[in-house]
């Protein structure tokens, strides 16, 4: 955001400060000035002169000798400029003066000093200047000739400062405006801050433009089909338009802000945009079919040619301005070539609207077009500002004689923004700032920026253009800004301290990290987007939900074009990279999100789930990985109820070495050996093992409320159980029987032997468990142990298990 000091003084006429004073004070009150440029920094001793007489140079065909009246005397200047004639008034740099650079437009640091000298034997006591030599350009001064000396208008006063006459005795400030201060994206907002900073009167323009006795609604009809994307649309009509140059003062204001003057109509819309921070657009009403404006979403693949002559392709997320037949503009971004203003325009339709900032930002990015207007709309403008801006534009049209304003306005208002109200709490404000200000002093500071006090409700009322005022802390900041941050006394911090505590989900994540790192795993991180080709690499079935990846609209490339639905690709890629680097024993883990759409194309936000993923190869096997998972479940209070189901059906895992981890009937994760074909596809030449635990599912069952039992007072009784077990029976099934049938007196059990050999019949294996029985309140009797063992044996028999003799 740039503004010139002269433009600010139009609204703060009593402002009298140097550029450095302005910079320091404004920065201290929160409107940070990044830097400034004095337009006349390298200009000196330049006055308006009038050419009284021109003679040919006796020794040079391309040079002429001019006698120039500079007010106090006449000086002789030799020049080669082809465009001067007797009577012209020109900028003259006198002997010892300085210009900013050469006629090629390149500036010289510190300027170029001009001295009296001779050209082909003829004395020259100065130099007449082109606009480029004065440090500016023809874009900023369109009346300047393409080649040659700048010619002043006839009413220029001979002898006066040419720098002042050209408006170069000015300073342009560059600001760093934060996104919450939308009001400061206009010169009026900056001027309001300057007036408050220097305690001067703020004099905004008095906007009043009723127009003639006609009605704008008789000229145009406005329909807004999507009120959420267009909270307000204002339209006014100006007829009998006369296109011509804008006045010099307006051109100078625009030039200082880096905007090239074009004509009175275009300059007025740009001027109001810079003044109010409200983008505007003008349409030739005669090109608007049906005299109707329709604000609607574009159609998918709709083509549209913008003012810059580029054809652009729209989708249904882009908001368009249309007439009765066609699109005439992209809302909030740029108008169309088919409705552009020409010198033959007779009737103009002015538009001042408020569009949804998020939609404008995404649309601008989607079609690859960003403009000054879209940059302002992105911040979220005040709908109440649109009417004042369009009235100001019409007022300027009347004042400059550029047309006849039609009475009334077509105003489609879908949102009336109410002023924000914040409770006034002087004690809280003093506590936050460490000050001892009275309520009256606070209210005086707040009044500087138009924050008023409602006595009846004891509230601070913020105008609608101050979208950043919502809480007491915001009010305290306003007080601090104008009291002076440098005046706030040094105090020790005070307040109520509370014990910090991690959210439950973060505690689970911390446990996952601790367990993984304790077991020798190193943390890795992979991209959240990947190539759709990995679905085939993982051997996913055609109807697998993991193939339903969300396509990214602006991917880094094909390899990063969909959001990941599984973390396996990233883990296996990392294992493969380590294997290719000949790292022999690798253990990695990752805590990362996967993105599962409810349906495609997206109609709502996808299901975003965090997965705890483990991967390893080298010195480890399936049971090592299972042990890490059990350790995790132990720490989160779930181990005793986690079952392992080998029928998980994962096509990317070895069919005989995989299992779902199930808690209370719900799958919380899976583990297994990577399928050899998948490992080969990734270039992993060793057996690899992975485990994936869904953290969000774990959150449903996890608990850190651990229960502790006292030290046993009574003796334990041990029984060994040796069995012949069918190979189809899983250890988990046996342990389930032991837990359910052993009752409360079964304290623990331990598998201590597995045997397969000639002494065991085919299809069976021998397994031996050690069972520990104990009662916490008394010494166990043999009958109690016998009864428990009988229940256990009956349960094992149901599984086809026989006791060994």
Question: Which residue stretches match the model-derived regions?
Answer:
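Glycine/proline-enriched, intrinsically flexible loops and inter-domain linkers
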Residues: 5, 24, 64, 198, ...
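A carboxyl-terminal module marker
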Residues: 448-451, 598-602, 607-608, 613, ...
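Beta-rich nucleic-acid/ligand-interaction surfaces
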Residues: 40-44, 211-212, 497-498, 502, ...
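Conserved mixed alpha/beta core segments that line enzyme active sites in large multi-domain catalysts
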Residues: 48-78, 158, 263, 269-338
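Phosphate-backbone binding interfaces of nucleic-acid-interacting proteins
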Residues: 1-214, 349, 368, 372, ...
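Terminal amphipathic helices with adjacent charged low-complexity linkers/tails
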Residues: 198-224, 401-429, 436
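Mobile "lid/hinge" segments at catalytic clefts and subdomain interfaces of large enzymes
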Residues: 120-135, 144-149, 163, 171, ...
């Amino acid at each position: 955001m740039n503004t010139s000091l002269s433009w600010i003084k139009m609204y703060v006429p009593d402002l009298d400060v140097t550029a450095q004073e302005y910079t320091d004070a404004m920065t201290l009150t929160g409107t940070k000035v990044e830097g400034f440029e004095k337009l006349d920094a390298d200009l000196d001793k330049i006055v308006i002169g009038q050419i009284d007489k021109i003679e040919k140079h006796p020794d040079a065909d391309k040079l002429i000798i001019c006698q120039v009246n500079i007010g106090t005397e006449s000086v002789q200047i030799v020049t080669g400029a082809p465009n001067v004639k007797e009577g012209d008034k020109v900028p003259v740099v006198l002997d010892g003066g300085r210009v900013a650079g050469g006629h090629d437009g390149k500036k010289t640091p510190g300027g170029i000093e001009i001295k009296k000298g001779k050209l082909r034997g003829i004395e020259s006591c100065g130099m007449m200047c082109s606009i480029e030599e004065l440090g500016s350009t023809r874009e900023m001064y369109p009346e300047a000739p393409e080649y040659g000396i700048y010619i002043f208008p006839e009413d220029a006063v001979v002898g006066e400062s040419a720098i002042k006459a050209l408006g170069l005795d000015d300073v342009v400030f560059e600001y760093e405006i934060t996104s919450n201060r939308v009001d400061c994206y206009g010169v009026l907002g900056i001027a309001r801050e300057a007036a408050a900073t220097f305690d001067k009167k703020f004099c905004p323009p008095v906007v009043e433009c009723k127009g003639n006795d006609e009605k704008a609604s008789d000229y145009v009809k406005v329909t807004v089909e999507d009120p959420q994307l267009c909270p307000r649309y204002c339209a006014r009509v100006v007829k009998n338009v006369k296109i011509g140059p804008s006045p010099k003062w307006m051109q100078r204001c625009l030039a200082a802000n880096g905007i090239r003057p074009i004509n009175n109509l275009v300059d007025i819309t740009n001027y109001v945009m810079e003044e109010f921070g409200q983008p505007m657009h003008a349409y030739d009403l005669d090109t608007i079919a049906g005299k109707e404006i329709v604000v609607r979403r574009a159609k998918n693949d709709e083509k549209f040619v913008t003012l810059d002559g580029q054809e652009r392709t729209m989708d249904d997320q882009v908001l368009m301005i249309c007439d009765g037949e066609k699109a005439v503009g992209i809302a909030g971004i740029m108008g169309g070539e088919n409705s552009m203003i020409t010198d033959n325009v007779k009737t103009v339709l002015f538009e001042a609207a408020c569009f949804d900032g998020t939609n404008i930002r995404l649309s601008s990015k989607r079609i690859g077009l960003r403009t000054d207007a879209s940059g302002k709309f992105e911040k979220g403008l005040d709908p109440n500002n649109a009417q004042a801006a369009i009235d100001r534009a019409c007022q300027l049209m009347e004042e400059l004689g550029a047309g006849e304003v039609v009475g009334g306005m077509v105003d489609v208002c879908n949102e009336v923004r109410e002023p924000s109200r914040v409770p006034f709490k002087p004690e809280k404000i003093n506590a936050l700032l460490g000050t001892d200000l009275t309520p009256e002093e606070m209210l005086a500071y707040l009044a500087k920026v138009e924050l008023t006090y409602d006595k009846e409700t004891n509230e601070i009322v913020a105008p609608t253009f101050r979208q950043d005022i919502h809480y007491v802390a915001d009010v305290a900041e306003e007080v601090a800004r104008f009291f002076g941050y440098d005046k706030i006394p040094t105090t020790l911090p005070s307040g109520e301290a509370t014990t910090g505590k991690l959210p439950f989900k973060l505690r689970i994540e911390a446990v996952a990290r601790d367990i993984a790192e304790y077991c020798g795993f190193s943390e890795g991180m992979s991209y959240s987007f990947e190539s759709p080709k990995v679905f085939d690499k993982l051997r996913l079935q055609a109807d697998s939900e993991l193939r339903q990846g969300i396509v990214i609209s602006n991917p880094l490339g094909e390899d990063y074009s969909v959001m990941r639905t599984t973390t396996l690709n990233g883990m296996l890629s990392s294992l493969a990279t380590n294997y290719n680097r000949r790292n022999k024993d690798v253990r990695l883990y990752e805590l990362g999100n996967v993105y599962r759409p409810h349906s495609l194309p997206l109609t709502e936000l996808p299901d975003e789930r965090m997965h705890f993923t483990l991967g390893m190869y080298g010195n480890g096997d399936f049971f090592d990985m299972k042990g890490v998972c059990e350790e995790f479940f132990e720490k989160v209070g779930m181990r005793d109820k986690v079952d392992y189901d080998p029928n998980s059906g994962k096509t990317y895992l070895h069919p005989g070495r995989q299992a779902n981890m199930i808690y209370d009937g719900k799958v919380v994760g899976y583990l297994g050996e990577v399928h050899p074909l998948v490992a080969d596809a990734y270039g992993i030449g060793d057996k690899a093992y992975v485990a994936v635990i869904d953290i969000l599912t774990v959150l449903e069952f996890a608990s850190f409320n651990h229960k502790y039992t006292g030290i046993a007072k009574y003796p334990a009784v041990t029984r060994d159980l040796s069995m012949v077990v069918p190979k189809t029976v899983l250890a988990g099934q046996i342990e389930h029987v032991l837990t359910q049938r052993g009752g409360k007196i079964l304290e623990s059990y331990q598998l201590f032997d597995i045997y397969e050999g000639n002494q065991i019949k085919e299809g069976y294996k021998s397994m031996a468990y050690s069972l520990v029985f104990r009662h916490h309140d008394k010494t166990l009797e043999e009958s109690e142990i016998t009864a428990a063992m009988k229940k256990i044996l009956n349960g094992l028999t149901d599984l086809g298990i026989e006791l060994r003799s």
